[in-house]
Every structure is written in structure tokens, then in C-alpha cells.
């Protein structure tokens, strides 16, 4: 079930109230650009959640603010973002959720454990091409039996939305990104024995998103 996006915008403003103005604006822009109101709905209450490339911890913070009572673990290669995530988590210490963030590159070794939900939003296109498959395979391996991989990334069509995403990353991330076709992502997931459960476009404002939810079956 989708959430009211206006509630998430209010949450983002409150969770990062002490951040610099530019970073506060960035968190609210993420709520407008990403289908968080949908992806949060796929997360069961009390779930263990791994957020790969978590940035400033927004996704896990929104889950906690919406009463999901998750055990959240996020990592990101940007130390400034992780510092902001840690300060945000302090505001949620009485939410019933446990949030932990660490500075880690997705290409480095990951914790050897599995999760109820693994989340990837706008991550793969930032990973160098030679490492993209390995990072995705690690994400799949972290999904426990019965668990979900919630994946969202920029869509290839329509072209003007794709261009908007590319320009955004040139301005904000200062890099030329390397998206993986969504059909390739579906093939990689199938090779990792994950079944496709949800397949839809989730366009927001000028940004295009391909949203996929995969599940690891309880049986082979």
C-alpha cells in the first residue's frame, strides 16, 4: 500500500532539520524523485533491512518515522552522507527502529549475513561497469529465503526522463553514469534464483524510475 508522499516530505524536513540548507533540500528532492511511498510499503513491520548506497539514510529514516520498527543497516561510500545519517538516526532513537550506518563502498567486502529486505535505489548506475554484476550478485545473496530485493533505478524510456536523470547526476554527483538495462537486471536476478513479483514504472516529477521487487523463494 502506498503512503501519502506529503507525510514523507514532512518526515524528511523534520529528520534533517539541523542539516545545512542544501542538504535539507536534497532530502526533500529525493522524496519527490524516488518512489519511496511505494517501496516502503513492501517492507514488513519488524523486518531486517539492508539499504545499499543509503546516502544520508533517508529511506531507512522514513521507514522508522512511519512506524515500521525495522532493524536497518545502511552503507554508503560518502563519509559526509554517513555522518548526516548518523545524526538523523539519533532523532529516531525512540521510534522502535534500530538504525546503523557505516562508511563502506559496495565493491568492498560486505557483512556476512542475510536480511528480510535488501533495498537498492539509484545505486547500480554509479558503480563502475566492471563491478556492476558483482555488486548486484552480492545484493541478491544478502536476501534470505522468503525475503525481498526492492530495486529501483532510472528508466531508459521516455528519453526525456532518462536525460533528466543524467543531467541531475552530472550536476549533483558530478559524474557520467552507467545505467544497466532493466531487462538485464531481471536476467541477473533470475540467475540468482530470485522471482520477479512486481514490475512497474514509477515516474516522479521529471524523473523516470523502473521499480522491481524480487523474492527469494522458500524452496528451490
How should these model regions be labeled?
Residues 1-19:
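N-terminal, positively charged/glycine-rich alpha-helical extensions of SAM-dependent methyltransferases
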Residues 14-33:
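Class I SAM-dependent methyltransferase Rossmann-like catalytic core
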Residues 29-45:
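Conserved alpha-helix/loop element of class I SAM-dependent methyltransferases that forms part
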Residues 47-55:
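Conserved class I S-adenosyl-L-methionine
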Residues 58, 62-107:
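Class I SAM-dependent methyltransferase SAM/SAH-binding core
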Residues 119:
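A conserved beta-strand element that flanks and buttresses the S-adenosyl-L-methionine
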Residues 133-145:
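A short glycine-rich, Lys/Arg-flanked "PGG" loop and its adjoining helix->strand segment in the class I
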Residues 152-192, 198-204:
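C-terminal alpha-helical "lid/dimerization" subdomain adjacent to the S-adenosyl-L-methionine
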Amino acid at each position: 500500500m502506498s503512503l501519502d508522499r506529503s507525510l514523507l516530505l514532512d518526515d524528511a524536513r523534520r529528520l534533517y532539520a539541523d542539516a545545512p540548507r542544501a542538504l535539507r533540500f536534497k532530502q526533500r528532492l529525493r522524496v519527490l524523485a524516488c518512489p519511496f511511498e511505494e517501496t516502503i510499503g513492501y517492507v514488513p513491520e519488524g523486518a531486517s533491512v539492508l539499504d545499499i548506497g543509503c546516502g544520508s539514510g533517508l529511506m531507512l529514516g522514513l521507514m522508522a518515522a512511519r512506524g515500521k520498527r525495522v532493524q536497518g543497516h545502511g552503507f554508503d561510500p560518502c563519509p559526509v552522507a554517513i555522518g548526516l545519517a548518523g545524526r538523523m538516526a539519533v532523532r529516531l532513537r525512540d521510534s522502535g527502529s534500530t538504525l546503523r550506518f557505516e562508511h563502506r563502498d559496495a565493491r568492498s567486502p560486505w557483512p556476512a549475513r542475510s536480511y528480510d529486505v535488501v533495498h537498492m535505489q539509484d545505486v547500480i548506475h554509479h558503480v563502475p561497469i566492471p563491478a556492476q554484476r558483482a555488486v548486484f550478485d552480492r545484493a541478491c545473496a544478502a536476501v534470505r529465503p522468503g525475503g525481498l530485493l526492492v530495486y529501483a533505478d532510472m528508466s531508459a524510456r521516455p528519453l526525456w526522463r532518462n536525460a533528466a536523470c543524467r543531467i541531475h547526476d552530472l550536476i549533483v554527483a558530478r559524474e557520467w553514469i552507467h545505467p544497466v538495462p532493466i531487462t538485464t537486471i531481471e536476467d541477473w536476478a533470475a540467475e540468482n534464483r530470485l522471482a520477479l513479483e512486481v514490475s512497474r514504472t514509477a515516474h516522479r516529477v521529471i524523473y523516470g524510475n523502473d521499480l522491481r521487487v524480487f523474492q527469494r523463494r522458500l524452496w528451490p
